[in-house]
């Protein structure tokens, strides 16, 4: 028997979509696979895939585990009261992605504040 679909409010949908964007963005910035991320927090990789595609949400404890991994790596996402998502990148991450950024953008187009 299929599970019933959950009905979500517009606010809950917005949170789920923000989570999806944050999950994928952080994982891509760090250059890790869905499998590796899943192993780190103790879930199956399809759980990460479903969360990133917006088909499901991670339980709060697993989201906190992900946020802790990202914070430790130097990534902090802030969702403002205006709904704008801002990314703070620590020096470790800047070093990791500096070469990729240099290939994609002219040097004068990159502004890094630490």
Regions found by a protein language model. Name each.
Residues 6, 60-78:
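DNA major-groove recognition helix of helix-turn-helix/homeodomain DNA-binding modules
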């Amino acid at each position: 028997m299929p599970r019933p679909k959950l009905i979500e409010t517009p606010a809950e949908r917005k949170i789920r979509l923000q989570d999806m964007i944050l999950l994928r963005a952080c994982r891509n910035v760090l250059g890790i696979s869905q499998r590796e991320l899943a192993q780190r927090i103790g879930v199956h990789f399809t759980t990460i895939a479903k969360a990133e595609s917006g088909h499901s949400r991670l339980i709060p404890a697993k989201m906190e585990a992900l946020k802790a991994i990202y914070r430790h790596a130097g990534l902090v996402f802030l969702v403002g009261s205006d709904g704008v998502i801002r990314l703070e990148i620590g020096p470790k991450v800047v070093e990791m992605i500096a070469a990729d950024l240099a290939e994609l953008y002219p040097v004068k187009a990159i502004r890094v504040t630490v």
